[in-house]
Design a protein with these regions (language model features):
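Conserved Rossmann-like nucleotide-cofactor binding loop
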Residues: 14, 37, 164
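Glycine-rich FAD pyrophosphate-binding loop
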Residues: 23-43
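Residues at the starts of beta-strands that form the adenosine-phosphate
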Residues: 5, 28, 226
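Conserved N-terminal glycine-rich FAD pyrophosphate-binding loop of Rossmann-like flavoproteins
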Residues: 36-56
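Conserved mid-domain beta->alpha element of the FAD-binding
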Residues: 11-24, 32, 158, 278-374, ...
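Conserved FAD-binding catalytic core of PHBH/FMO-like flavoproteins
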Residues: 111-116, 122-280
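Conserved N-terminal helical subregion
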Residues: 2-6, 23, 50-171, 175-187, ...
Length: 437
C-alpha cells in the first residue's frame, strides 16, 4: 500500500509543526518555501500554554525552555499607574505558564526536530507555488524555480504560506483585509527595570499602546537574554517612526509623561551605540474563512485565520492547527487510505469553534486598544478593572489568554493536547459550523 505523500506550502510555524507530526506518523512530506533559506524576521512572540502543549506533544518543549523566557502573566498599565489588565496563568491552572521566544529560536527548535525525520522530508527552497489542481486521486501543484516552471503530484496539499496567501481557495474566504493599525518593533537587551516574567503593556486611550515582552535568547547567543519592544501606530505612520533625532525626542517625551521609568530605560537603549535598536514594521491582516479544508486541500496557520495580535494567539493557533490535522488524519486513515470528508469533519470539530471564538474576540477588543474612536479607551478603562474584581471573570480571561478556549463556556485541558492518545474519540466532539457569533 502506498504511503501518503503531503505537500506543505510554507515553512512557518504551522507548516513546520505539521510536517513533524505527519512524518512522525510515517507519512512522506514535501515542503515548498519561496525563500532561499529560513531566516525568520519578526519580533519575539508569546507562546501561550496551548502552544506549549503542542510543543510537548511534538517533543520540543524542553529544548524551547532552555532558550525561551518563562512568562507568568500579562499586566497592562495606564498612565496613572493603575493596572487595566492583570491576568496571570495561575488563575486558569497552577501549572500553566507562557514562553516568550524569538522567531529565530522558534524556527530553530522546529527545524531541529524535523531533521530527525529527514528520510521522510523533502525540501524545495526558492520554489514558488502559483496554483494547484485537485483530481480524484491526487493534487497537482504548479510553480516556478529560477524562472523554470515545475509541477508535481501529491496525495494532499496544505496551504501554510501566511496571511497574504494567494493560494487559499477564494470561495472559502469570507474576509481578507489589512488592519489599519500595525506596530513598530525592535529586539533589545533584556529589560532590567520591569519584572522579567511578565508581558508588560502600556495604554493611553485607544491611540497609544506599547509592549515589552521577555524574549529569551537566540541559539547562537544563548547567554544574551532579550526583550521585544512594540509601539502601536496607524499603518501609514510606520515607515517614518523614529527616523530622526526630533522624532526620537518627541517619542521619549510621550512615554516619559506617562511611564517615566520605562522612558529612562528606552533612552538608555536608544542612545547606547552598542545596543542601538533597529526598528522594523509589522502589518496585520484579518482573514476569516467559511471552511479550512475540503477534499485533498487544507489551509492552516495565518493563511487560514490571520488576525490582530491583540490576543497574542497567532503562533498558538498555528500549532493547534498542526496538532488538530495530525489527530484528524489518524482518525480518518485506515490502511494508508484517507477518508477525506471524515478528516475535515473531525478537523473542523477540533478547530472551528475555537478559531471562531478568538477571531470574534479579536475583532471586538482590538478597537478598544488601536483605533481613532474617541469613546473606545474610556469604555475599556471603565469596564476592565471592574471585571478583574470578579473571580469568575479573572479565571475565564486567564483561560482565554492561555489559548485553550473552544467557545465562550468551553475549553480544552492542557493534557488533552500535550499527551493525546491516538484514539481521539475521548473528545465527545459535536459537529459545529463556522458561523459567526
Amino acid at each position: 500500500m502506498k504511503t501518503p505523500h503531503f505537500a506543505i506550502i510554507g515553512a512557518g510555524t504551522a507548516g513546520l509543526a505539521t510536517a513533524i507530526l505527519l512524518a512522525r506518523e510515517g507519512n512522506h512530506v514535501t515542503i515548498f518555501e519561496q525563500v532561499d533559506e529560513l531566516s525568520p524576521v519578526g519580533a519575539g512572540l508569546l507562546l501561550q500554554p496551548a502552544g506549549l502543549a503542542v510543543f510537548e506533544h511534538l517533543g520540543v518543549l524542553d529544548k524551547a525552555l532552555t532558550l525561551g523566557a518563562k512568562v507568568t502573566g500579562l499586566e497592562g498599565q495606564l498612565p496613572d499607574k493603575r493596572l487595566l489588565v492583570n491576568s496571570h496563568y495561575r488563575e486558569a491552572s497552577t501549572n500553566l505558564y507562557g514562553l516568550g521566544i524569538h522567531r529565530a529560536t522558534l524556527c530553530h527548535v522546529l527545524t531541529q526536530k524535523l531533521n530527525e525525520y529527514s528520510s521522510q522530508i523533502t525540501w524545495y527552497m526558492n520554489h514558488s507555488v502559483e496554483r494547484f489542481e485537485e483530481h480524484n486521486d491526487e493534487v497537482r501543484i504548479f510553480g516556478s524555480h529560477q524562472n523554470q516552471k515545475f509541477d508535481a503530484c501529491f496525495d494532499g496539499l496544505l496551504i501554510a504560506n501566511g496571511a497574504r496567501s494567494q493560494l487559499r481557495p477564494k470561495a472559502w474566504v469570507k474576509v481578507d483585509k489589512a488592519y489599519p493599525w500595525g506596530a513598530a518593533w525592535s529586539i533589545v537587551p533584556e529589560c532590567q527595570v520591569l519584572d522579567s516574567e511578565i508581558l508588560h503593556q502600556f495604554y493611553d486611550r485607544s491611540k497609544i499602546m506599547m509592549g515589552i515582552l521577555p524574549t529569551g535568547a537566540i541559539p547562537t547567543e544563548p547567554q544574551q537574554h532579550l526583550s521585544s519592544v512594540f509601539w502601536s501606530l496607524p499603518t501609514p505612520q510606520l515607515q517614518s517612526f523614529l527616523q530622526d533625532e526630533q522624532a526620537k525626542q518627541a517619542w521619549l517625551k510621550q512615554v516619559s509623561e506617562r511611564w517615566p521609568k520605562v522612558a529612562e530605560w528606552l533612552k538608555e537603549i536608544l542612545y547606547n551605540s552598542q545596543t542601538q535598536p533597529k526598528w522594523l514594521s509589522a502589518n496585520y491582516r484579518d482573514v476569516v474563512m467559511t471552511q479550512f479544508g475540503q477534499g485533498r486541500i487544507g489551509v492552516i496557520g495565518d493563511a487560514a485565520h490571520a488576525m490582530s495580535p491583540q490576543l497574542g494567539q497567532g503562533a498558538n493557533m498555528a500549532l493547534l492547527d498542526a496538532w488538530a490535522f495530525s489527530q484528524s488524519l489518524q482518525h480518518a486513515q485506515k490502511n494508508q487510505n484517507i477518508d477525506w470528508p471524515l478528516l475535515w469533519q473531525h478537523y473542523h470539530q477540533l478547530r472551528g469553534s475555537s478559531t471562531q471564538f478568538y477571531q470574534f474576540l479579536s475583532r471586538l477588543l482590538t478597537p478598544l486598544y488601536q483605533s481613532d474612536h474617541w469613546w473606545a479607551g474610556g469604555l475599556r478603562d471603565l469596564v476592565f478593572p471592574w471585571m478583574y474584581q470578579i473571580p469568575y471573570f479573572r479565571k475565564e480571561m486567564a483561560i482565554t489568554i492561555s489559548g485553550l478556549k473552544t467557545g465562550p463556556f468551553r475549553h480544552l485541558e492542557y493534557d488533552q493536547v500535550a499527551q493525546l492518545p491516538k484514539e481521539s474519540s475521548a473528545f465527545n466532539l459535536k459537529s459545529e459550523s463556522l458561523t459567526d457569533f
